[in-house]
Amino acid sequence: MSNRTIFEEVSSDSKQQSSPTPGGIDRKRRGARGAIRVWLAVLFALVVAMIAVGGLTRLTDSGLSITEWRPVTGAVPPMSEAEWQAEFEKYKQIDQYHLMNTWMELSDFKTIYWWEWGHRQLGRVIGLIWALGFFGFLVTRSIPTGWTGRLLLPGILGGVQGAIGWWMVASGVTLGEGMTSVASYRLATHLGLAFVILGFLAWYMFLLGREERDLMQARRLKEEKLFGMSTGLLHFAFLQILLGALVAGIDAGRSYTDWPLMGGQIFPPRPFMIEPLWKNFFENPGLVQFIHRVAGYLLFAFAVVVWLRGRRSAHKATQFAFNAVFAALSLQLVIGIVTVMTAAPVEIAIVHQAVAVLVWVLILRARFLSAYPVATSIKGH
């Protein structure tokens, strides 16, 4: 049995025969594809914004400013000076304040509080828009056949993401344990799931952008080898995104600022200084940055191989998609080097993360077109 990947189209719809005289409900569902696609596009844009705001929240060390998890009542921020002072007093009970921010006044605390509150509030908005859209389409029976489960999935994953977000924050809301930030592996889990959700939304948008009949015909032209290679590239890119989260989680991007060497050496000094040994792969800044660097080189090398194969596609749109992937990855490699050599300032680090989103979506697009080519070849037939 062939392996299935997280974004592979496995719909049973392709097995259905189109009715010669579709009924009113079928026509209604077919017509709703555009509306559902717009709804997904709104969710997609909000998730991209969520990733950006989450990145800025981490880079500004704002993520621990709200020490409680109140999914509903937390939507209302402090409204009076007394309420603000109460929130500040809660923050003063955790290690981050005692070890990093004893200099803070209430006005300084408000700045980091708003970042974290905005991040959580955006999550609530995403959940609300998903629920309104999903149940609205469900009640009006506008969801195309076979799509109910698919459209339910982002909502379920969003709920899980909220729980993971608090699990992540809870790792840093400590006293006496020396934690000044969230656990890096929990941060990687949180960011990784955000990219998974974004991937599903993008894939569904690609599918709904074409008629079911067109997809059925296009699948007969599927480029199996290119599809498999792009799937591998997608998974490799996902791994690199997780490694990037580990780097951000422990500020490893600032540990060595020379390139191509690290501290004047190929391998960073004291790579296994933490006990037990396995913790170095998650908590040793030098080793974590080294792994992220090497993975980046390997990802780029593999991308070149995939790109060269993609250029041989018989379809112009597929060729263009793989050209775009190669261009975006080339840009990302350069930005990554600049990020290291400038000690990861916030403005460059957030651009690095934003381009990672671009690379992710472009790889998905190229993978989609290798599975469902647009039936116009480079020879014009």
Swiss-Prot record:
TM ranges: 36-56, 125-145, 151-171, 187-207, 230-250, 287-307, 320-340, 344-364
Key words of the record: Cell membrane, Heme biosynthesis, Iron, Membrane, Metal-binding, Oxidoreductase, Transmembrane, Transmembrane helix
Function: Catalyzes the conversion of heme O to heme A by two successive hydroxylations of the methyl group at C8. The first hydroxylation forms heme I, the second hydroxylation results in an unstable dihydroxymethyl group, which spontaneously dehydrates, resulting in the formyl group of heme A.
GO molecular function list: metal ion binding; oxidoreductase activity, acting on NAD(P)H, heme protein as acceptor
Enzyme class: oxidoreductase
Pathway: Porphyrin-containing compound metabolism; heme A biosynthesis; heme A from heme O: step 1/1
Protein's recorded name: Heme A synthase
Native species: Ruegeria sp. (strain TM1040)
Oligomeric form and interacting partners: Interacts with CtaB.
EC annotation from Swiss-Prot or TrEMBL: 1.17.99.9
Chief site of localization: membrane
Recorded catalytic activity of this chain's protein: Fe(II)-heme o + 2 A + H2O = Fe(II)-heme a + 2 AH2
Membrane topology label: Multi-pass membrane protein
GO biological process: heme A biosynthetic process
